[in-house]
């Protein structure tokens, strides 16, 4: 080949590479067609079709309206699973593939008609990495199996994904469930009014708002700014995890109940660990140490913050519990898998409990590190310690960027004994010492 053709081929390759660096935009709409080009004027109909077109750095805009999924939309069946939308194409570091709501619009994905017999329905299964899902709702996810089972709205198996400002509600499924993958962030999401009346005894014993059950290597996963309420089992459930997870600035309330406060399943706000009856020889090494901080648990059926027999201890830091049956329950077990004992090895700093049926249960304080809390001290919180106690504040709308609503609920009143009652840790504080509880007075946070 002569020099000129070689230069032309090289220039053509460079041009194609440069064009691909310019991120593309695709559109999906309820009235769209998967035979369309995916433009704003001629959008796709399904997220699954948009994935085939998208490449790292691209954005898929989801237009407002209701997407009514059918069984024909199931992307893959595998063993007992039906993956309706399967996101298995990855972005790249710094160039995620984004599936986001069009500004000012609300896409709603309705799975109430997806009822494959004897299958676990996973509405969105995310096995890809470097993806960003933002700003849509998932409703009506079904359960079709009578025995022990679960369905899932957002099933995360990849890494470096962001799940942001999703509302997962009024179905029979877990909201967000992380089973594998590392460094995923679940940010400012809501999971509520989810209950499975079909499987087992009909109490909905597997329907949590948010679940983390990561395999070995699934490190660095975080739930931040999320709310879970009226889920028939737990708000947040971290049982049977091989790696540690963090929940911070999260709220869990009314779990274990239906909206009319009929009792359903377990009803813990934060079930922060445990490995059920797993023999000690089969426990992960090291046993993960979960962290729950700056979080709120209100009026859950059972416990607000619960260690669930977790060996090795859990970190509960700067949390507020109100009106739970037990506000803080640190129950442990012996290595015989049978004997319940007060939990050991826990770290409890600057927590605040108020008006629980019991403030603190099952803690071996001598074998744990405990400081700056309202329990095991010389004072107990009363209503006078708080600016507001209006439970309606828990479900107020989020801020313009998806942030939790700033209200007077459980904020510390001037002169509260919780002010400056904590011990200094790593974070900033106002006054002589940090406050006890989830909210630092004088910061607006």
Placement of each model-derived feature along the sequence:
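Bacterial N-terminal signal peptides that target proteins for export
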Residues: 1-11
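Acidic Gly/Asp/Thr-rich repetitive segments characteristic of extracellular carbohydrate-active
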Residues: 30-69, 75, 83-87, 435-438
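Right-handed parallel beta-helix
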Residues: 63, 96, 100-105, 129-140, ...
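Bacterial N-terminal signal peptides
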Residues: 9-20
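Right-handed parallel beta-helix/beta-spiral solenoid domain characteristic of secreted/periplasmic
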Residues: 64, 68-77, 83-147
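Predominantly extracellular beta-rich ligand-binding scaffolds that present long acidic/polar faces
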Residues: 81-82, 291-409
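Extracellular beta-strand/beta-solenoid scaffold signature
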Residues: 75-87, 114-124, 146-155, 170-178, ...
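Surface beta-loop-beta hairpin patches that serve as ligand-binding interfaces in beta-rich domains
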Residues: 400-445
């Amino acid at each position: 080949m002569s020099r000129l053709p070689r230069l032309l081929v090289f220039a053509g390759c460079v041009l194609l590479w440069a064009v691909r660096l310019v991120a593309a935009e695709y559109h999906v709409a309820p009235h769209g067609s998967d035979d369309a080009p995916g433009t704003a004027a001629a959008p796709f109909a399904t997220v699954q079709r948009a994935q085939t077109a998208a490449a790292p750095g691209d954005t898929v805009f989801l237009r407002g309206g209701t997407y009514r999924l059918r069984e024909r939309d199931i992307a893959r069946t595998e063993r007992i699973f039906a993956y309706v939308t399967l996101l298995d194409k990855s972005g790249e570091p710094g160039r995620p593939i984004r599936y986001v709501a069009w500004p000012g619009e609300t896409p709603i994905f309705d799975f109430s008609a997806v009822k494959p017999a004897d299958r676990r329905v996973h509405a969105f299964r995310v096995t890809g990495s470097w993806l960003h899902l933002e700003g849509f709702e998932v409703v009506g996810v079904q359960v079709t199996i009578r025995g022990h089972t679960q369905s899932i709205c957002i099933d995360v198996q990849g890494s470096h994904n962001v799940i942001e400002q999703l509302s997962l509600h009024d179905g029979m499924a877990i909201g967000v469930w992380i089973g594998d993958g590392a460094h995923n962030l679940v940010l400012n999401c809501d999971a509520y009014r989810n209950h499975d009346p079909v499987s087992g005894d009909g109490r909905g014993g597997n329907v949590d708002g948010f679940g983390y059950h990561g395999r070995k290597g699934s490190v660095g996963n975080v739930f931040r700014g999320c709310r879970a309420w009226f889920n028939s089992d737990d708000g947040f459930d971290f049982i049977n995890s091989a790696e540690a997870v963090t929940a911070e600035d999260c709220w869990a309330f009314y779990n274990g109940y239906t909206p009319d406060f009929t009792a359903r399943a377990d009803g813990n706000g934060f079930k922060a660990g445990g490995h059920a009856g797993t023999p000690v020889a089969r426990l992960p090494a090291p046993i993960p140490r979960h962290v729950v901080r700056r979080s709120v648990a209100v009026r859950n059926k059972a416990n607000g913050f619960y260690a669930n027999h977790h060996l090795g201890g859990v970190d509960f830091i700067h949390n507020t519990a109100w009106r739970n049956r037990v506000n803080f329950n640190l129950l442990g077990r012996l290595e015989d898998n049978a004997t319940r004992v007060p939990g050991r090895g826990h770290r409890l700093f600057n927590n605040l409990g108020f008006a629980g049926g019991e403030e603190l249960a099952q803690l071996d304080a001598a074998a744990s590190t405990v400081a700056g809390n309202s329990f095991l001290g010389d004072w107990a919180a009363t209503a006078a310690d708080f600016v507001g106690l209006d439970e309606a504040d828990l479900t107020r709308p989020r801020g313009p960027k998806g942030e939790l609503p700033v209200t007077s609920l459980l904020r510390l009143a001037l002169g509260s004994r919780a002010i400056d009652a904590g011990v200094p840790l790593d974070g900033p504080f106002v006054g002589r010492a940090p406050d006890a509880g989830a909210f630092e007075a004088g910061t607006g946070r």
